[in-house]
Amino acid sequence: MNKHLLLLIISFFSLPDRAFGYEIVVLKSSTSTINQQIQNIFTDELDKRIPHRGLKSIQPHQVTEVVITKGDEGGCTRRIQSIHPDLILALGGQALKVALLVPDIPVVHLLVIHPETSIDKKRPVTGVSLSVPPKVQLDEMTRYFPEVTRIGLVYDPKRSSKIVAQLDSVRPDLEFIALATENIAEVPELIHSLRGRVDLLWMLPDLTTTNHITIQSYAIFSIKNKIPLLTFSQKLLKHGATIAVTFDTDEMARQAAGLAMDILSHRVGTELTALVDPPVTTIINHTMTANLGISIADRRTADE
């Protein structure tokens, strides 16, 4: 009896088509709604990507949630090490920093601003960027407002010079009037100086020129001059923006699951792309387009 049982166990674990799940730690600094939503979608997508072939003897992935306690980052790293995960999903900048304190474990990150400052090149570390490339934003804008050819923007050279430097090359068919300042107080007047010179005003994700003090100036200019206002955040549509081209968090979670499977299945190593562009969603504020008397070329997007 024992001999037969032993043979059965050996045969079971030697099946070439058996698919084992992975041990994954989801590391985050809070249990916010967005973190939980991303975690759920990531886990569901990962389960869908388990190889299904042969006898399909499937062991599901084991996902352990670790929430960072302020001041106890060392305790978090020790707990993760005790789990011996195959991969860490880090949600947010603090989570990425803590994840990189755990040696040798591959990391996939989401919701991290400027992650390139934290990347460890000695192991697989990758993630989805929070920055939508300028060309993607401009191409989406053109899809809805094809008659726009002159675009105005105000920017801080210390924060956004890299974005501005590439505009002429990514969209040579457009004219850009880019006004530089490092002083928040100058932003309203610079916006006003664009009157009659542009067909669209563009808000950059620049803390000097786009903030709670300057938002009203953008909206007033758009309304007075009957031109659309392009922004990077859905929330700013409620403050008078006309179109938002922003990252899609649900699709980012699915994209992260794909990156994780690439690492776990050894399809990539330390040479993998450190940062990939995010999937985007475009939202039109149809109330504002009506108020501005502007027609749009693509009406598939729902009202905001």
Name each model feature, range by range.
Residues 7-14:
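Bacterial N-terminal signal peptides
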Residues 19-304:
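Short hydrophobic alpha-helices and adjacent helix-cap/hinge residues
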Residues 1-4:
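Positively charged n-region of N-terminal signal peptides that target proteins for export
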